[in-house]
């Protein structure tokens, strides 16, 4: 059986990864990166970009922000705003002049919204890039698997890397709850991957 991922190498964060990225991008300024990341409340939203930007040359990386908003203002909007402020600061500091956003409203029909998001991502012009980095740190599992599948299925002949920022001290406090224990929120679609409440945060994946 042929595995599509057999030629991929998985590296965890150690000095080897930092050295690899520095050597690979600093010595190959002709390489052009499109960096996809999710827009959300998760404090890890900008960790990956903050990690990558010092290792590439100015103008070597563009960004595509994936947003999956609700039509109503969420109670965690302040956290999203803080993340966006930091993201814009990174754009300015590292001269990321080309950055765009793909946005689909997930507050109504989840399956329809997911298909629409896949279509928008598939139509994005990846032609000028040699490397595609997908940062799934702030993207719900129910969404990022489809994004990865969509881009991989385009058979672009590009290097595609998947990055995730993990925080063990944060993740250890996440406990699985049976759906019967969840309190419904009027107007909130249970299948969507965003948080439904703060303190504690309930996330449907």
Predicted regions and their residues:
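Residue(s) in the substrate-gating loop at a strand-loop-helix junction
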Residues: 134
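Long, low-complexity, Lys/Arg-enriched
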Residues: 1-131, 142-205
């Amino acid at each position: 059986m042929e595995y599509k991922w057999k030629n991929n190498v998985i590296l965890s964060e150690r000095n080897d990864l930092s050295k690899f990225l520095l050597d690979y991008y600093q010595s190959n300024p002709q390489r052009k990166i499109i960096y996809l990341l999710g827009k959300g409340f998760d404090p890890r939203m900008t960790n990956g970009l903050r990690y990558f930007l010092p290792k590439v040359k100015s103008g070597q990386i563009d960004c595509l922000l994936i947003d999956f908003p609700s039509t109503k203002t969420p109670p965690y909007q302040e956290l999203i705003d803080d993340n966006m402020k930091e993201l814009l600061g990174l754009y300015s500091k590292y001269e990321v002049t080309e950055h765009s956003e793909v946005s689909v409203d997930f507050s109504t029909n989840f399956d329809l919204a997911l298909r629409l998001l896949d279509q928008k991502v598939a139509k994005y012009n990846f032609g000028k890039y040699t490397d595609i980095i997908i940062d799934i740190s702030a993207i719900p599992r129910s969404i990022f698997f489809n994004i990865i599948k969509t881009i991989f299925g385009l058979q672009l002949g590009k290097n595609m890397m998947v990055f995730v920022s993990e925080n063990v001290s944060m993740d250890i406090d996440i406990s699985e709850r049976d759906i019967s224990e969840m309190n419904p929120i009027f107007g909130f679609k249970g299948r969507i991957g965003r948080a439904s409440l703060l303190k504690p945060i309930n996330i449907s994946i």
